[in-house]
Amino acid sequence: MSATLSAYRNALRATKVVFRHDLPILTAARTQIKENIRNNSNLKDTTEIEEAVKKLNDVSKFLISNIVQGEKQDDGKYFLNFHEKTELGDNESIKQGKKNLGSLAGKKGSSIRSCKD
C-alpha cells in the first residue's frame, strides 16, 4: 500500500475516533481531508508528495492525541469524551516549570491580596 493511501486512511480513522459523537463535524473533517487530497493529487515532485504525506500524518496524530469532544449536560457542566488514545499529561512539566518562575513560584504569602469591590 502506498504511503499516501496509508496516510489518507489513518486520517479518516482519526476523524472517526475523535468525532464519533458529532456527525456534522465528522463530515466536515472528512470533507476537508478529501478536498486536500484532491488538491494535492497533481503533485509530481517526490519531495512535495512526501511533505504532503507527512503533513497528513501529523494532522492525524494531532487529532488522535489532542482533540477531545465535549458535550454540555443539562446541569451546565461539560462531559468530555476521552478515548484510549488521548494524550494525558502527568503534570511533570508544570512542576518543573515552577522551579524556574522565580521567588513566588508555588508559594503562598500574606502579602498577595485580591481586590474586592
From Swiss-Prot:
Known InterPro entries for this protein?
Complex1_LYR_LYRM7 (IPR045298), MZM1/LYRM7 (IPR050435)
Q: Locate the region Disordered.
A: 91-117
Output the CDD domains linked to this UniProt entry: Complex1_LYR_LYRM7 (cd20267)
- Where does the transit peptide lie? 1-10
- A GO cellular-component term linked to this record: mitochondrial matrix
Q: Which UniProt keywords apply?
A: Chaperone, Mitochondrion, Transit peptide
Where found, per UniProt? Mitochondrion matrix
Query: What are the recorded GO MF terms, alphabetically?
Result: protein folding chaperone
Please list the GO biological process terms of this entry: mitochondrial respiratory chain complex III assembly
Task: Kindly report the protein's main subcellular placement as a broad class.
Answer: mitochondrion
Record's subunit section: Interacts with RIP1.
Q: Which family would the database say this protein is a member of?
A: Belongs to the complex I LYR family. MZM1 subfamily.
Q: What does this protein do?
A: Assembly factor required for Rieske Fe-S protein RIP1 incorporation into the cytochrome b-c1 (CIII) complex. Functions as a chaperone, binding to this subunit within the mitochondrial matrix and stabilizing it prior to its translocation and insertion into the late CIII dimeric intermediate within the mitochondrial inner membrane. Modulates the mitochondrial matrix zinc pool.
Q: Please report the name of this protein according to its UniProt entry.
A: Mitochondrial zinc maintenance protein 1, mitochondrial
